[in-house]
Amino acid sequence: MKKYEILGGNLPVVVCELSAGESMITESGSMSWMSPNMKMETISGGGMKKMFGRLMSGDSMFQNRYTAEGADGTIAFASSFPGAIKALDIRDGHSMIVQKSAFLASEEGVELSMHFQKKLGKGMFGGEGFIMQKLSGNGTAFVEIDGHAVEYELDAGQEILISTGYLAAMEETCTMDVVTVKGVKNMLVGGEGVFNTVVRGPSKVILQTMPISKVAELLTPFFTKNK
């Protein structure tokens, strides 16, 4: 990829400039606009195991590959929700674990696969999802962030306590666990839920300020009170 630019503030789009022959991989339906010489091809992106993994994580079983044919090309991918688009530098030894359905697009050298939480309870009770997505290989990947992205660099053994839904991404070297909110009264009337997610360093953690699940929870009463 020659270059990219993220535009639009909190209604973002990433515009990618490709050299002739270069390709971008994206989920079905993610392309917003492109130059006429961009050729689309629907691909499986791997064997049945990877296809099933994408289906389990809430994505389409197939992906689209866009290639600049004969000359340089332009292609744009817009976010599906108000927030941010984050560019991640993926390379050998620096894989990223991201929230389910965060993947927007990437260079062809990036591999998208499912990532199971090692303990079932971490995903079910921590609110981050039993299945997350793993970005590995080499290249630039773009992911969607719900709201504003806040980054922390954790030292080895350093921890951060995260409320349900606010974990957007973390490097693979981080570990994740789930803890219960202390005190029965806090659990029942504190309004913060029963479980929190603990991420332990070393490496980078990316948090988001407006999880879709929280927005849906706040809006639900307005759609149902007249029924």
Segments predicted by a language model, with ranges:
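Composition-driven recognition of glycine/serine/threonine/acidic- and proline-rich low-complexity segments
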Residues: 1-227
